UniProtKB/Swiss-Prot annotation:
Organism of origin: Ningaui yvonnae (Southern ningaui)
Protein name: Cytochrome b
Highest taxon in the source lineage: Eukaryota
Quaternary organization: The cytochrome bc1 complex contains 11 subunits: 3 respiratory subunits (MT-CYB, CYC1 and UQCRFS1), 2 core proteins (UQCRC1 and UQCRC2) and 6 low-molecular weight proteins (UQCRH/QCR6, UQCRB/QCR7, UQCRQ/QCR8, UQCR10/QCR9, UQCR11/QCR10 and a cleavage product of UQCRFS1). This cytochrome bc1 complex then forms a dimer.
Co-factor note (free text): Binds 2 heme b groups non-covalently.
Known role: Component of the ubiquinol-cytochrome c reductase complex (complex III or cytochrome b-c1 complex) that is part of the mitochondrial respiratory chain. The b-c1 complex mediates electron transfer from ubiquinol to cytochrome c. Contributes to the generation of a proton gradient across the mitochondrial membrane that is then used for ATP synthesis.
Note: Heme 1 (or BL or b562) is low-potential and absorbs at about 562 nm, and heme 2 (or BH or b566) is high-potential and absorbs at about 566 nm.
Cellular localisation: Mitochondrion inner membrane
Similarity remark: Belongs to the cytochrome b family.
Keywords assigned by UniProt, alphabetized: Electron transport, Heme, Iron, Membrane, Metal-binding, Mitochondrion, Mitochondrion inner membrane, Respiratory chain, Transmembrane, Transmembrane helix, Transport, Ubiquinone
Residues involved in a ubiquinone binding: H201
Length: 381
């Protein structure tokens, strides 16, 4: 009799996706982050669901309901700490996953890459609306500053901002709709993840060498299920260490104060995973220009496949491109640092220089490096 997992209509899909899936034999630990992101999403949905059971999306009670979760609900403190730090782990895995895609040329699977960029934007939107929910000082002022950027759009900007707010300022209507968005978006993300995997399984995984791996494939289970399980252990170790020993180290102290529209915090800044984009936004002295630069910093990922000039897919054997890639990484870390600093010299000029370098690296230097490497590979005799 044929195995049930190969004949049953539902089991067959799971079998072709996670068990008998042919996978390249040489994919490294950098390919673990896809499965880790899936686990992060499940953790966030489950912890978020339990938090939503006790949370109230009202300006008068939101802050105290979060305090109630931490003090009175059984293991509420743990659920909240896992959810808050789980978001940081999610973004850490996301950035490493995108970085791996750029380094090894995975962006040449255009459909998978484009859905991935849409996923990144959706996760960022989810994290932003989620950060507003505790209704602390930084939640309120973060929501005010970021939603206010919509008013920079010519002609329809102010109308758009007021439409998002549900009034003339960030208030009860805003909090209620942000809770609704924060609840629904993870399920939209789940649907997009399935589409992402659908496109990926059309082509099969890329591999570190960047060459066609069809001549040497192995089954996903048990080889990569075990490998992913090891990655999961590391993820849980870091997440639990953060959540149990230092749960507030990545948060902002201002968020321990209830939202007060009459008192502006000295430094309004988002969570660490948005700081690079926030630094780019602040580096341009014009409001509309800043908003466009902020959008461009993420949407630039969509044109990376069009800027690939090298004959080789991966950067594994391309030292010049490798050097530029690590300069890009250092540049993004610098922008993250700048985003958390006050708007004063020398931070302003460092932020502006890093923002210019970022666009130069992606739009000019890396495509030129690809052409240079092609030239160097040509026989000279």
């Amino acid at each position: 009799m044929t195995n049930l997992r190969k004949t049953h209509p539902l089991m067959k899909i799971i079998n072709h996706s996670f068990i008998d899936l042919p996978a390249p034999s040489n994919i490294s630990a950098w390919w673990n982050f896809g499965s880790l992101l899936g686990i992060c999403l499940v953790i966030q949905i489950l912890t978020g669901l339990f938090l939503a059971m006790h949370y109230t999306s009202d300006t008068l009670t939101a802050f105290s309901s979060v305090a109630h979760i931490c003090r009175d609900v059984n293991y509420g403190w743990l659920i909240r700490n896992l959810h808050a730090n789980g978001a940081s782990m999610f973004f850490m895995c996301l950035f490493l996953h995108v970085g791996r895609g750029i380094y090894y040329g995975s962006y040449l699977y255009k459909e998978t890459w484009n859905i991935g960029v849409i996923l990144l934007l959706t996760v960022m939107a989810t994290a932003f609306v989620g950060y507003v929910l505790p209704w602390g000082q930084m939640s309120f002022w973060g929501a005010t500053v970021i939603t206010n950027l919509l008013s920079a759009i010519p002609y329809i900007g102010t109308t758009l901002a007021e439409w998002i707010w549900g009034g003339f300022l960030v208030d009860k209507a805003t909090l209620t709709r942000f809770f609704a968005f924060h609840f629904i978006l993870p399920f939209i993300i789940m649907a997009l993840v399935i589409v992402h995997l659908l496109f990926l399984h059309e082509t099969g995984s890329n591999n570190p060498s960047g060459i066609n791996p069809n001549s040497d494939k192995i089954p996903f289970h048990p080889y990569y299920t075990i490998k992913d399980a090891l990655g999961l252990m590391f993820l849980l170790l870091v997440l639990l260490t953060l959540a149990l020993f230092s749960p507030d180290s990545l948060g902002d102290p201002d968020n321990f104060s209830p939202a007060n529209p009459l008192n502006t915090p000295p430094h309004i800044k988002p969570e660490w995973y948005f700081l690079f984009a926030y630094a780019i936004l602040r580096s341009i002295p014009n409001k509309l220009g800043g908003v466009l630069a902020l959008l461009a910093s993420i949407l630039i990922l969509l044109i990376i496949p069009l800027l690939h000039t090298a004959n080789q897919r991966s950067m594994m054997f391309r030292p010049v491109s490798q050097t530029l890639f690590w300069i890009l990484t250092a540049n993004l870390i610098t922008l993250t640092w700048i985003g958390g600093q006050p708007v004063e010299q020398p931070f302003i000029i460092i932020g502006q220089s890093a923002s210019i370098l970022l666009s130069m690296l992606i739009l000019v230097l890396m495509p030129l490096a690809g052409l240079f490497e092609n030239y160097m590979l040509k026989p000279k005799w």
